[in-house]
Swiss-Prot record:
Its biological purpose: Non-reducing polyketide synthase (NRPKS); part of the gene cluster that mediates the biosynthesis of the linear tetracyclic TAN-1612 neuropeptide Y receptor antagonist. The decaketide backbone of TAN-1612 is synthesized by the non-reducing polyketide synthase adaA via condensation of one acetyl-CoA starter unit with 9 malonyl-CoA units. The FAD-dependent monooxygenase adaC then performs hydroxylation at C2 while the polaketide chain is still attached to the NRPKS adaA.
Protein name: Non-reducing polyketide synthase adaA
Region called C-terminal hotdog fold, residue ranges: 1482-1629
Enzyme class: transferase
Residue ranges occupied by any Carrier domain in the UniProt entry: 1716-1793
Catalytic activity: holo-[ACP] + 9 malonyl-CoA + acetyl-CoA + 9 H(+) = 3-(2,4-dioxopentyl)-3,6,8,9-tetrahydroxy-1-oxo-1,2,3,4-tetrahydroanthracene-2-carboxyl-[ACP] + 9 CO2 + 10 CoA + 2 H2O
Residue spans of biased composition, Low complexity class: 1642-1659, 1683-1706
Catalytic residue positions: C561, H696, H739, H1348, D1540
Length: 1793
């Protein structure tokens, strides 16, 4: 049969369909990967138009709305403007080509247009669309070529309008006039004669003439400027009385040869801007509308030029087109069919079709409309990218006002039409003192109303691993975010890592929060350790990510009132961008701060009369509300693949801003409408298809009016009325629960999601009086309703409900979501019905476990028809599992109810214990041949594809080795007892290997911790352990079986299992010559022995033993394995096994042959296999050996791998308390066995991979909405006390200021920038003593300290103490030796014990003392620096820094110069070597900015300290060039910034060199052994220094080096043994932070700083904490003391804590020592830990981990400080990591303290 001819006809008019609907359809299908070519074409066309618009003049550009897709262009009527021709031409081209491409993809049609059979034709602009096809050889080329067609059509349209408007200006009123009329009943020649006459008589210029633009036999189209056409029809009698009709041509003249020329056309086309190669060849015939013949163009450039020339200058002759088509059709004489494709129909097309039918009556002529496919539904969208996905909301949770603490209560509240507003409760603030309706009280609220969550402080701290102290300080918003996040995830069935979309690295959180009441008010009353992580907004999300271990983005957003919905929109954007696969989003608001009430009231936001009255005449502002809500969102395709319950689908979401509003807080209807239009375009949804809008609806006059305007104009426009069956319902949840501010949007979203579930719209209760007169009065006519009663919202069959959710921010933001119904679930997978199902329940506390059991029981009592399989699937595969567990395997719901009732009534929960923190090890034990039976593992084979595939793959290998298939055995097709030894043994080993791999899958582990195989089972064990390949194991099993069958007689020998030791058997059977003979075959336990021998001998033995009361059982095997009967195969087996490779086991092998544990790769070899066949199985000895080595113990889990658990009893006998599970059991359904085994493993702490267990039939199961987790809640609440938010309004400047102790007169003339007051100075003939007081807060001293900052704190450098030492040293020396010119000094043995950190309160003195004693005969002066108590003026007993000054005997310094000159060349040599290394790029050269940028890793120097101009550094060696500042900046001996500049190179070497581990550590100097300067440093002086640091061999983590200072290549100073100690970076805060207590300020530090050395306390049984002495300075940098000591014991009952927070009821929930029984140091430590964390001592059980107790790194530092300061114990904070449990810590304390 010959191929048909094809005609594709492209018209020049839009179809009569709704243009927006057509483009919406294209846009919607373009998001589906089944329409990839269509999507690409739409994207390319959009890009082309964007580029063309961008090149337009500015006035024209402004006429085009911003567009990211084509939808906004369809919303604008361009015809009245200058872009009418351009846009209509481009959109028609896009529409026709888009429909063509989409039709091909929808029909999955292959390209079937050939050059000899296909013809293309078109009219006017339709020719350009046709050109896109004419240039193509396949569909993808149509996409590329089509974009160029769009470009050309747009440019031609712009040009036509530009020229035409120069011929005649548009109408002033904007009305449209036609540029073409069609005249019927006239011939072209007659009409041309009449037009020529008219044009001549009227003197019409050629340019403006009326002319013929198209013609056929019966009609003629007349074109020209509109006024000229009207004049012609009035003036010409022939025209006036002709039959004519104005055509819808409003944009200018085409087909006008007198108007356009080819040169202009070429310039307009601008071929250099083509988006395709202009040389692309023409592939298909495209007929000219003038000649009816194919265009003669051969390339794309020629074709577009020809078409454009014809469009602008050529006359259309419809008759020629028809003739050309008939001619092309006639050429295919052999064709019997003619297929025509077009876009709807037209008069022209009807005429063409009639002509074809008349000319070819024998041909079958069929027509295809290319439009209808766009309205078809092709099933669930298959998005081509994340950006095209619909999104699925799969989980939600909330805490809302009015007691709506869960979704059911929230819906109940809405359904009942309740109003939840009340007066402010007492737990927020005292309304009596903070409410003043008159407004006269500053900072008071003018309204007493709000909507509040009941007890928002309730929280299960233990569940979230938080201590009570941390929970108390954590914002309740953050806590409830955690709680609702968990509940939403639980509802969604999210289990981390279960599916690709639940990969924790790809889960993100987005929450909206707009206030910080708790941090600013409640927690700030007593700022504690957790003030920052507990109150800063970022931690709301961060805590969720951290707790659940989510690695995706974490964003906390503030967009004022729209924060919650904006967070949802941001979350959706992350999904569309592919940044995450699952998101948690929500909004948070808990009101406690009256300041915000005052601010909002004064800003006229709040209603003074009560609730939000949305759209009511009396609306007077909003009523504030609490609210916390969370939703879980995924891409729709992921949710469907994951078998999730889909609550609703998000089609689009967007946020914009009301930039044009009259004020920043005033809403703007225009911006709101723009946002609606944007989301509707994104979703490709008709606004009339929206059936519900959840209003933002604050109940303000301005807000209600603006939102009413925007909603009604877009969703119920007057110019496009809704039908009666298209009602639009409106509502606002704020009428019920008030305005939740940051949580308002999420509350609205939750309401709509519940409406989808309940198929009902709650009553709108926001109009207590009459509707606001600002609202349009024609709502009913526009089919818009505010339901005053509950209204049904059913989902009609095959229909989809769509809704809008609005949320607007007071700052001007507008957020809108478009929702639709979830797709109807189609269950296409048949479920394998399992006889028994596991059901598991878990919790994180005993109390919650009991409550969870009770709620599940209540659920089943209310829903007795619950499907057990669905329940099992939900509790096992779709729940997060916790440490307290119950599990059972049941066959029906009544059995489960019985189990749960027993658990409740028998208090089974109290007898449970939490699973261990580490999963117990698993050992696989493989049974031997005695476990065989027909149909082994049949149920698993039939139901589990993974197991079935493994068996079939192993069976395939076995068959390729030449052995028979064992599948018939599994399927029970082989009768019991008829299988050969070969089939029997292969069946067992194949099933065991497959079972092992199934268990590895179900347990989620790569390998067992050890394996042991019994007899035949050892082959499977060796294969699993990697000793043998699977193929080699099967080969050996099969070959050995063949040898046994060939060389051993079945039935001649047997095996007997005896319940006795081998010694008992020997004693009872005897050993004489007449005694029956036997051999030991297996020693299974110490009391279970298997012997083998001939049938006769074993029968005799059995008779004897049973006579003695010994139990005996015949082993059901045809041969006596492990006896002399096997000798017949040994030699042959040895030959077979010789070529088999053996490898080192990947896991320990418990060898029953060797009676030991095998780790090496040599013990198991070919000889081993032969011996194992002949020699006895020492199963008991192997287990004993494993126990002795600690490979197995009572905690080990044993999995019996085999058809029947024969080895289970052996293991139980050998390992007391052993827990062993079975794979299969004879005469028991496989899934009954498997379910029970999985439950056992689950309860033991080895959680199975439940997802894999249910994966085969997962789509056939349903996720049930079970009761939510029952929390063990305690009300953690810090009550706002007093009236300080009011009082602060009345504070005035002023107040007393303490007088600094340094302000009293000094008894000496000595006073410098660092020495402020000399309190004692005594001088005699040979000695002098000086005592001085200095204040760090003195401006000069403080400026010097702040020149050296660490951890953002000013820290005193060594140079400060050096200047003080030199100042006092020179002063006292001159007192004893008057007239001395220059005093040389050597600062020796200088050591700083503690850092001195400047307090932040500069108004409070921070004194220190310096004491010096000079002894002239010894030329020695001692120095000591002390802390001073600013309150008592008492100095500390011990100094924080010490040193001495030595005065050289030679006051000229000549001896120093001689000494240094001897080594100068060495120093210069090292400097030159460093320069050489730098030239070779082996050493680093650092500029000043780079050097001090590196220094910032530890210390930040002020500009005056930055003397180093250049540094060359290599490892721990360096030199630098230095220029000192010219200004001394104070009164000094030597300015500290000069001293530091010439010496801090050593600090840079240690803290900036790549040879140091600066990521984990920083390095600080405790001092030096000597510091000498032979000459004074000079202002602006240039110096060079050199240093090399070495590790000190006698002191760990300590470095030292000599630093040399040179001027003009001469050494002028040396710092000897300059030391640096390595300190963990995490202690930076601990050592370098200002003390909170100004009276107990921090101690000084050298540059960069000194840290206290670790001091070891001698072990002692009891160390009593000592109360600090008021007259002494306590150890530096300790935490502030508590007001009172902790009680000696903690109460276990619920009682208020020191902050008014109830302590949770404690339970003895785990085995271990009772903390209250721990005494001595350990007991006191536990009391301190309990006090600091807020826990009860009874909760510190031995197996409780510090992670579970909420002891994080921050708390660890606090505890270590407390233990040191209060008990004198030097304990590092990392001890809580090294001792992870309370028991570990108490053991360490008892041993070392």
């Amino acid at each position: 049969m010959s191929a048909p001819t094809k005609l594709v006809f492209f018209g020049n008019e839009f179809p009569n369909d709704d243009l927006k609907a057509l483009f919406r359809g294209l846009h919607r299908h373009g998001k589906d990967r089944r329409f990839r070519q269509l999507a690409t074409f739409l994207e390319e066309s959009t890009r082309v138009l964007q580029n063309e618009v961008a090149q337009l003049p500015e006035p024209l550009k402004k006429l085009v709305p911003h567009f990211e897709n084509l939808m906004p262009l369809t919303e604008v009527d361009f015809r009245q403007g200058p872009l009418g021709a351009a846009m209509e031409s481009a959109l028609l081209t896009i529409l026709e080509l888009g429909m063509f491409i989409g039709h091909y993809e929808a029909e999955e049609r292959v390209w079937d247009l050939s050059a000899d059979r296909a013809t293309l034709a078109g009219l006017s602009i339709g020719l350009l669309a046709a050109a896109g096809v004419a240039l193509s050889t396949h569909l993808a080329e149509v996409v590329q070529n089509g974009a160029e067609c769009v470009r050309v059509s747009f440019r031609l349209g712009v040009y036509v309008h530009d020229i035409s408007r120069k011929l005649e200006a548009p109408q002033a009123d904007g009305s449209l006039l036609s540029w073409a009329h069609v005249v019927t009943g006239e011939t072209a020649s007659d009409l041309q004669e009449e037009l020529s006459r008219y044009n001549t008589e009227t003197g019409t210029p050629e340019l403006l003439k009326v002319f013929i633009s198209a013609a056929d036999k019966t009609s003629v189209s007349v074109s020209g400027p509109p006024s000229r056409i009207r004049a012609a029809f009035r003036a010409s009698q022939r025209l006036r009385y002709s039959k004519s009709l104005a055509l819808p041509v409003y944009d200018g003249l085409c087909h006008a040869a007198h108007l356009y020329d080819e040169e202009t056309i070429h310039r307009v086309l601008h071929p250099d801007g083509s988006v395709i190669p202009t040389s692309r060849p023409v592939q298909l015939a495209l007929l000219s509308s003038r000649s009816g013949q194919p265009f003669e163009a051969t390339t794309a450039a020629e074709l577009f030029r020809a078409i454009s020339t014809e469009l602008l200058t050529g006359t259309i002759f419809l008759d020629n087109i028809t003739a050309g088509i008939l001619d092309r059709t006639e050429r295919c004489a052999d064709a019997t069919q003619c297929q025509i494709e077009t876009y709807r129909t037209s008069l022209v097309f009807k005429g063409l079709l009639k002509a074809l039918e008349a000319c070819f009556p024998d041909r079958t002529i069929s027509t295809t409309d290319l439009i209808p496919w766009v309205f078809q539904d092709y099933g669930a969208r298959q998005p081509k990218s994340c950006a095209d996905s619909k999104l699925a909301i799969v989980g939600m949770a909330c805490r809302m006002p009015g007691g709506a603490n869960d979704l059911d209560l929230f819906w109940e509240l809405l359904a009942q039409g309740r109003d939840t507003h009340t007066t402010v409760p007492a737990d927020r603030f005292d309304l009596e003192t903070h409410y003043d309706p008159t407004g006269e009280t500053e900072n008071a609220t003018r309204t007493p109303f709000g909507n509040f969550i009941d007890q928002p402080g309730l929280f299960d701290a233990g569940f979230f691993n938080m201590s009570p102290r941390e929970a108390e300080q954590t914002d309740p918003m953050h806590r409830l975010a955690l709680v609702t996040a968990y509940e939403a995830l639980e509802m969604a069935g999210i289990v981390s890592g279960r599916t690709p979309s639940s990969n924790p690295k790809r889960i993100a959180t987005f929450y909206g929060q707009a206030s910080d009441d708790w941090r600013e008010l409640n927690a700030s009353q007593n700022i504690g350790t957790y003030a920052v992580p507990g109150g800063e907004r970022a931690f709301a999300n961060g805590r969720i990510n951290y707790f659940f271990k989510f690695g995706g983005p974490s964003f906390n957003l503030d967009t004022a009132c729209s924060s919650g919905l904006a967070a949802v929109q941001a979350a959706c954007s992350a999904l569309w961008a592919g940044e995450a696969d699952t998101v948690l989003a929500g909004g948070l608001n808990i009101i406690t701060d009256p300041d915000n009430y005052a601010g909002l009231g004064n800003g006229h936001f709040l209603s003074r009369t009560g609730q939000c009255k949305v759209w009511d005449q009396s609306a007077d502002g909003y009523c504030r509300a609490d609210g916390v809500g969370s939703v879980v969102i995924k891409r729709l395709e992921d949710a469907e693949a994951d078998n999730d319950n889909i609550l609703a689908v998000v089609l689009s979401a967007a946020t914009n801003h009301s930039a044009e509003a009259i004020s920043i807080t005033h809403p703007h209807a225009g911006a709101q409408k723009e946002n609606y239009t944007q989301v509707l375009h994104q979703a490709a949804v008709n606004p009339l298809d929206i059936s519900y809008v959840e209003l933002h609806g604050t109940g303000t006059q301005a807000g209600d009016a603006q939102e009413a305007e925007s909603v009604l104009d877009i969703f119920a426009p007057r110019n496009h009325r809704r039908r009666a069956d298209q009602p639009l319902h409106l509502g606002a949840v704020k009428s019920n629960i008030g305005h939740g501010e940051a949580a308002a949007g999420i509350a609205s979203l939750l309401k709509v999601l519940l409406m989808y579930q309940k198929n009902e719209i709650p009553a709108h209760i926001g109009i207590p009086t009459v509707i606001n007169p600002a609202i349009p009065t024609d709502l009913e006519q526009r089919k818009v309703y505010l339901p005053r009663t509950k209204t049904a919202w059913p989902r009609a069959a095959g229909q989809i409900r769509r809704a809008i959710v609005n949320s607007f921010g007071a700052h001007g933001g507008n957020t809108t979501l478009v929702l639709e119904d979830a797709p109807e679930k189609q269950v296409t997978v048949a479920r394998e019905e399992r006889s028994t199902h596991p059901v598991v329940i878990s919790a994180k506390s005993k109390k919650s476990l009991a409550a969870n059991v009770e709620t599940l029981l209540a659920y089943l009592d209310e829903n007795p028809e619950t499907d057990l399989g669905d329940l099992s699937y939900t509790t096992c595969a779709r729940r997060m599992h916790h440490s307290w567990r119950l599990a059972t395997a049941v066959s029906d719901i009544p059995a489960l109810q019985k189990f749960l009732r027993n658990a409740v009534s028998n208090d089974a929960v109290s007898q449970t214990r939490p699973i261990p923190t580490e999963a117990p090890p698993v050992v696989f034990t493989f049974t031997g041949q005695g476990a065989y039976y027909a149909g082994l593992a049949q149920g698993l084979f039939q139901a589990l594809p993974f197991f079935r595939a493994e068996v079939r793959q192993l069976d395939h290998l076995s068959q390729r080795l030449g052995f028979p298939s064992i599948v018939p055995v599994i399927l029970g097709e082989v009768e019991e007892g008829t299988a050969t030894a070969l089939v029997t043994q292969l069946s067992i080993v194949i099933v065991e290997i497959a079972l092992a791999r199934l268990w590895l899958l179900l347990l989620g582990i790569p390998a067992p911790h050890a394996v042991i195989g019994h007899s035949l089972g050892e082959y499977a064990a060796l294969a699993v352990a990697g000793v043998l390949s699977t193929a080699d194991a099967l080969y050996l099993v099969g070959h050995r079986a063949q040898l046994i069958e060939e060389h051993c007689t079945p039935g001649s020998h047997a095996m007997l299992s005896v319940r006795a030791t081998i010694a008992d058997i020997e004693r009872l059977v005897g050993t004489g010559s007449d005694a029956p003979t036997y051999e030991l075959s297996c020693q299974n336990t110490h009391q279970d022995t298997v012997i083998g021998g001939s049938i006769q001998d074993l029968n005799a033995i059995r008779e004897k033993l049973e006579h003695e009361g010994i139990k005996c059982v015949n082993v059901d095997v045809p041969f006596a394995f492990h006896t002399a009967q096997m000798d017949a195969v040994r030699e042959r087996l040895a030959k077979a096994v010789a070529a088999v490779p053996f490898k080192t086991p990947s896991v320990p092998v418990l060898s029953p042959l060797l009676g030991s544990v095998v780790f090496d790769g040599k013990s198991i070899n070919p000889e081993y296999i032969v011996r194992a066949t002949r020699e006895p199985v020492q199963f008991a000895t192997a287990i004993d050996a494993a126990q002795e080595l600690g490979i197995v113990n009572s905690q080990t889990l044993w999995v019996d791998i085999g058809p029947h658990p024969i080895c289970a009893s052996f293991v139980r006998s050998l390992v007391p308390g052993a827990r062993i599970v079975s794979s299969c059991r004879r005469n028991e359904d496989n899934f009954a066995t498997m379910a029970k085994s999985l439950c056992t493993l689950h309860l033991a702490g080895r959680t199975p991979s439940w997802a894999e267990y249910f994966r085969p039939d997962e789509q056939a199961y349903s996720l049930l909405r079970l009761p939510k987790y029952r929390w063990n809640e305690v009300n953690y609440w810090i009550q706002y006390l007093g009236t300080w938010t009011l009082d602060k309004a009345h504070l005035k400047n002023g107040g007393s200021q303490k007088r600094a102790i340094t302000d009293v007169p000094s008894i000496s003339s000595l006073r410098t920038s660092l020495i402020h007051q000399v309190t004692e100075e005594t001088v005699d003939k040979t000695t002098a003593t000086l005592k001085a007081i200095s204040d760090i807060q003195h401006p000069d001293f403080l400026e010097a300290v702040h020149g050296h900052t660490m951890n953002n704190c000013g820290v005193a450098t060594s140079s400060i103490w050096t200047d003080m030492a030199m100042t006092v040293g020179e002063h006292l020396y001159r007192r004893l030796v008057p007239g001395t010119d220059h005093v040389l000094m050597d600062l020796c043995d200088f050591e700083v014990q503690h850092a001195q950190v400047a307090n932040t309160n500069s108004n409070t003195p921070q004194p220190l003392a310096l004491e010096a004693h000079l002894d002239l005969p010894t030329r020695h002066m001692s120095l000591a620096w002390y802390d001073v108590n600013a309150t008592t003026n008492q100095r500390a007993d011990a100094p924080f820094a010490t040193g001495s000054i030595k005065y050289p005997a030679d006051p000229t310094g000549a001896a120093w110069s001689i000494e240094w000159s001897r080594i100068t060349h060495l120093i210069q040599g090292r400097i030159e070597a460093l320069q050489h290394l730098a030239a070779e790029n082996k050493a680093s050269t650092l500029s000043k900015p780079l050097a001090y940028a590196l220094f910032k890793n530890v210390v930040d120097y002020a500009p005056r300290y930055r003397g180093m101009d250049r540094v060359v550094i290599h490892d721990h060696e360096a030199f630098s060039d230095i220029t000192l500042t010219t200004d001394r900046h104070g009164t000094w001996h030597t300015p500290p910034h000069w001293i530091d500049s010439v010496s801090h190179l050593a600090g840079l070497v240690m803290n900036g060199s790549d040879a140091s581990n600066t990521r984990d550590f920083f390095y600080v100097t405790p001092g030096c052994s000597s510091c000498r300067m032979a000459e004074p440093l000079i202002a602006g002086g240039k110096y060079r220094n050199y240093v090399r640091m070495f590790p000190m061999p006698d002191e760990a983590h300590m470095y030292a080096g000599d630093l040399y200072i040179l001027r003009e290549d001469k050494i002028i100073g040396v710092v000897e043994q300059l030391k640096f100690r390595r300190v963990p970076r995490l202690l930076m805060d601990r050592f370098f932070s200002p003390n909170k207590n100004a009276a107990a300020h921090a101690a000084p530090a050298p540059a960069p700083a000194a840290v206290p050395a670790v001091k070891k306390q001698p072990p002692t049984e009891t160390i009593q904490p000592q109360a600090p002495k008021t007259e002494q300075k306590q150890d530096q940098l300790q935490l502030p003391n508590l007001a009172s000591a902790a009680p000696s014991t903690a109460s276990s009952s619920s009682s208020p804590s020191s902050s008014g927070v109830a302590t949770p009821t404690t339970e003895q929930e785990a085995p271990g020592a009772d903390a209250s029984a721990v005494t001595g140091v350990a007991g006191k430590c536990l009391e301190l830990i309990a006090n600091e964390t807020g826990l009860g001592v009874a909760e510190l059980t031995a197996d409780a981990t510090f992670v579970q107790l909420g002891v994080d790194s921050l708390m660890s530092l606090v505890l270590s400080e407390k233990l040191r300061s209060e008990m004198g114990l030097e304990i590092k904070s990392s001890l809580f990591l090294e001792c992870p449990t309370v028991g570990d810590l108490t053991g360490w304390l008892e041993q070392y303290c």
